[in-house]
């Protein structure tokens, strides 16, 4: 596997307790998210759209909602009988496309437990600029394996596919068109209407792109079957699309990996949402989800506070950037830590202007579109959500001028505590900043507890952090740039930190190469001309010109891990999420960059360390050997070889009757020989190069059905 895509490191983990779905009706007596109240009451609601703009939804609008249910078939049938679209995702979740006016009618269904408000996710490409991180593997070193992901389905749910890029030629078994549904088709779409920067093209090539003549920038699982799904990145779309990928793979008897290089800052960050729980239910033996952690490692989008006095509120200053966000739009959520379904906190959005505090009345809050509060039925935690143009709040409170500060005001009993998050990605420049205005003070936020919502927070998703495969790149014009991601080999400065709130689930689980990565570019993207400086290679293929370039992000680290897991699944198709975590825990490469880890070899920045393709494969084969099946295959591709400058490690891919490992000099003289009797899959032998004088040798592996010879250079 002599690829320019650097694969080095590994992962693993502890068991993850499943969250039993708990949905109750509390004091309001309603069975829908409080954010839907305005629509139910005949008013408008603000939502985030796929292009990061704020969109107004009216009671007459059609919306997509996920519905927690007791009887999925009965609820689906009732919705369809009313003339609307519905699809069963799991036995506990139905996705429905309904007019907002139908919410109350749907809630009357006895098998409906709770109607969730729509959520919007976004791509997790590093915001500063695209970077490339492809490191050339030194000649004579690297990983040589017959495992290519053959027979494994890799589903990429993303935005920005150049479908005709030769990296995907002959590899795509199904497409998902630009829709909010999960329908797959054999027909290639004419274009991806959601292609702004070619994100999906870059991602899919890292995971599994083919080698194109004239380019060295190809993927990891080059034999895998691809399903390319262009998604609107709403929760309902992702749920339906993930189910379709799973259904296709399982119908064809194939293991599968779903790559999710997207997420959101807003949510409880505890894996409790209906979306997280039901996406986890789709996973199982031979079915793995891999998700990007996020790119907020440098930002102050999170805050944790504890009430220290019954009489003194805590303030959080939600700063906006006038250069990027002149309308002062704020999207923020606050979540209490108590899980007893009680409202311990009094939470209000307020304004400080000069030295005066403007505090809304309860009536003003009730009428404030974009503000909602309540008890979440999935985790029993109190929450408050704010999504509005802050000028609206200023108008209601009769605040003049534009230099005012919008704050959360939180009161409670001593010892009460909460987490808060602010979206500074879709609304660039927003963050929690320190403030001191008269008697009103606020401390700055931090970058902790930033596991990406909607993908990485899924209980059974492998959450991936990013380290730097390189720190510089040279473009087509020969100009060399510093990518601005930090030191080569270190954690990418943008990589989001864990942990998950209130859970022992390891998030992240592992780090993959995501800083300065070179991969396929989409020439069809809306921003293609703006990315000319980051193009590193162009090739001519079948009468067309195609491009490769540099991007950075946990979006790029994630498909590297997805591709490696596909190799492991080819070797052992019965691997589960728990098996993958065990592999990562046992084989994660923890060098000096990774630093201090806990008793489980984990920390909140790196997870279990850098992913290690070879040692992970060894562990996967060992697990296969422990399955109780002991068939001797005498295969034609018996070994995987990890070639390093000081040793060659030989790993048996299957059970063999025997093997001989021999080293000859260029005169044909036998220098070293080892006979291995009945090696089992996962058996390893090490050839120590320190035992040989500098020079060129021939390394020969012989089994019943094969004989393989490789050149070995000792320096």
Report each predicted region and the residues it spans:
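Autoinhibitory N-terminal propeptides
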Residues: 5-14, 18-145, 151-154
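C-terminal subdomain of the subtilisin-like protease fold in secreted/lumenal serine endopeptidases
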Residues: 52-56, 252-264, 268-271, 286-293, ...
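Catalytic-core segments of hydrolase enzymes
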Residues: 253-356, 401-521, 587-588
């Amino acid at each position: 596997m002599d690829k320019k895509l650097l694969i080095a490191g590994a992962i693993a983990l502890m068991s993850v307790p499943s969250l039993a779905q708990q949905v109750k009706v509390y004091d309001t007596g309603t069975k829908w998210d409080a954010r839907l109240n305005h629509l139910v009451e005949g008013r408008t609601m603000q939502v985030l759209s796929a292009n990061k703009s704020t969109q107004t939804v009216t009671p007459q609008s059609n919306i997509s909602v996920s519905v927690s249910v007791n009887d999925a078939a009965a609820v689906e049938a009732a919705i369809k009988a009313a003339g609307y679209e519905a699809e069963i995702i799991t036995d506990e979740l139905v996705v429905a496309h309904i007019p907002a006016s139908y919410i109350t009618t749907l809630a009357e269904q006895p098998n409906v437990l709770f109607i969730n408000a729509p959520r919007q996710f976004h791509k997790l490409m590093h915001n500063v600029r695209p970077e490339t991180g492809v490191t050339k593997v030194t000649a004579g070193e690297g990983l040589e394996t017959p495992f290519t992901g053959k027979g494994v389905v890799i589903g990429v749910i993303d935005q920005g596919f150049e479908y005709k890029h030769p990296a995907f030629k002959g590899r795509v078994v199904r497409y998902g068109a630009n829709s909010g549904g999960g329908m797959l088709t054999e027909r290639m779409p004419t274009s991806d209407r959601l292609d702004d920067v070619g994100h999906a093209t870059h991602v899919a090539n890292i995971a599994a792109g083919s080698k194109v003549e004239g380019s060295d920038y190809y993927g990891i699982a080059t034999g895998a079957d691809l399903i390319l799904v262009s998604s609107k990145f709403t929760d309902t779309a992702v749920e339906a699309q993930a189910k379709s990928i799973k259904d296709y793979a399982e119908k064809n008897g194939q293991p599968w990996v779903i790559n999710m290089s997207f997420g959101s800052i807003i949510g409880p960050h505890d894996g409790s949402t209906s979306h997280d729980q039901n996406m986890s239910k789709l996973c199982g033996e031979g079915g793995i989800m891999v998700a990007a952690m996020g790119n907020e490692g440098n930002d102050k989008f999170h805050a944790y506070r504890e009430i220290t006095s019954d009489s003194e509120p805590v303030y959080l200053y939600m700063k906006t950037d006038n250069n990027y966000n002149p309308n002062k739009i704020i999207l923020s959520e606050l979540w209490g830590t108590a899980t007893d379904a009680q409202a311990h906190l009094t939470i209000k959005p307020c304004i400080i202007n000069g030295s005066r505090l403007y505090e809304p009345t309860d009536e003003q809050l009730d009428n404030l579109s974009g503000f909602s509060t309540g008890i979440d039925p999935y985790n029993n935690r109190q929450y408050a959500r704010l999504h509005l143009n802050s000028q609206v709040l200023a108008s209601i409170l009769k605040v003049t001028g534009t230099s005012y500060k919008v704050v959360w005001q939180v009161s409670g009993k001593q010892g009460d505590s909460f987490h808060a998050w602010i979206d500074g990605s879709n609304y660039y420049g927003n963050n929690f900043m320190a403030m001191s205005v008269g008697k009103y003070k606020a401390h700055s936020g931090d970058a902790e507890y930033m596991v990406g919502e909607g993908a990485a927070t899924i209980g059974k998703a492998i959450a991936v952090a990013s380290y730097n495969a390189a720190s510089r790149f040279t473009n087509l014009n020969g100009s060399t740039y510093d990518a601005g991601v930090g030191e080569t080999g270190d954690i990418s400065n943008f990589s989001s930190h864990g942990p998950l709130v209130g859970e022992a689930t390891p998030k992240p689980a592992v780090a993959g190469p995501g800083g300065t990565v070179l991969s396929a570019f989409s020439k069809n993207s809306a921003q293609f001309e703006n990315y000319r400086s980051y193009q590193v290679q162009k090739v001519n293929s079948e009468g067309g010109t195609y491009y490769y370039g540099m991007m950075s992000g946990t979006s790029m680290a994630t498909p590297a891990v997805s591709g490696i897991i596909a190799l492991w699944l080819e070797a052992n198709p019965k691997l589960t999420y728990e098996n993958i975590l065990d592999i990562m825990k046992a084989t994660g490469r923890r060098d000096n960059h990774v630093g201090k880890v806990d008793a489980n070899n984990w920390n909140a920045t790196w997870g279990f360390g850098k992913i290690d393709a070879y040692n992970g494969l060894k562990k996967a084969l060992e697990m296969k050997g422990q399955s109780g099946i002991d068939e001797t295959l005498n295969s034609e591709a018996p070994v995987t070889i990890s070639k390093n400058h000081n040793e060659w490690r030989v790993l048996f891919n299957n059970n063999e009757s025997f093997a001989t490992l021999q080293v000859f000099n260029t005169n044909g003289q036998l220098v070293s020989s080892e006979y291995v009797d009945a090696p089992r899959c996962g058996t390893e032998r090490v050839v120590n190069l320190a035992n040989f004088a500098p020079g060129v040798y021939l390394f020969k592996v012989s089994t019943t059905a094969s004989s393989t010879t490789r050149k070995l250079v000792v320096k």
